[in-house]
């Protein structure tokens, strides 16, 4: 706290909880169960499926309906495309290590628990921003962390789920401008 003037936490909870870990677990299983991975190869089918599972955690039903409601099969094609694209820029081992590292995120570890760790932030002007349709890190988790930290809380309204912080740039800009004048 003594080195930070202001803090913004955007679409992230104080710890990687059981819901978010479950998505990572399924993604890892997709890779580990790929017969190619078991032979020591890159696991293309498992990696593509892992990315599809992850994409489902980053998005929300409202956004899928708005974009592909008239042609639902295009949503499936989109997930396949994302999986194929992912293969060109990520290695299975890197993905496994990164997802396990994410699962260990817990600001309370070694600090007396989450509540105690967040109380230390009360001396810092802080803003926590949740997203109303975020399936990965539900708004209530971010709001709960903000309350424990004695921080302000704002919420992005969007049909795009967790990815809204990347898509709803006007809302993000408005929220940040109000906090970081």
Q: What feature does the model see in each segment?
A:
Residues 143-181:
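Catalytic active-site module of serine/aspartate enzymes centered on a nucleophile-bearing elbow/loop
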Residues 8-85:
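Alpha/beta-hydrolase-fold enzymes
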Residues 135-141:
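Conserved alpha/beta-hydrolase "acid-adjacent" motif
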Residues 93, 120-126, 149-150:
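Short, proline-enriched alpha-helix->beta-strand connector loops that line the catalytic pocket
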Residues 128-130:
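Short beta-strand/loop motif that positions the catalytic acidic residue
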Residues 132-134, 160:
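Acidic beta-to-alpha connecting loop that harbors the catalytic carboxylate
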Residues 81, 97-118:
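Active-site nucleophile elbow and catalytic-triad environment of alpha/beta-hydrolase enzymes
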């Amino acid at each position: 706290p003594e080195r930070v003037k202001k803090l913004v936490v955007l679409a992230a909870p104080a710890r990687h909880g059981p819901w978010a870990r479950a998505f990572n677990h399924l993604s890892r299983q997709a890779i580990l169960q790929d017969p190619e991975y078991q032979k020591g190869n890159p696991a293309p089918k498992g990696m593509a499926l892992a990315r599809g599972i992850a994409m489902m955690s980053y998005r929300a039903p409202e956004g899928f309906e708005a974009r592909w409601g008239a042609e639902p099969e295009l949503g499936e094609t989109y997930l396949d495309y994302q999986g194929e694209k992912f293969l060109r820029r990520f290695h299975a081992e890197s993905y496994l290590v990164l997802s396990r590292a994410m699962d260990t995120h817990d600001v309370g570890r070694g600090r007396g628990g989450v509540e105690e760790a967040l109380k230390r932030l009360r001396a810092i002007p802080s803003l926590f921003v949740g997203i109303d349709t975020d399936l990965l890190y539900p708004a209530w988790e971010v709001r709960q962390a903000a309350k424990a930290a004695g921080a302000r809380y704002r919420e992005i309204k969007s049909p795009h789920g967790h990815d809204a912080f990347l898509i709803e740039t006007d809302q993000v800009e408005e929220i940040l401008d109000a906090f970081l004048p």
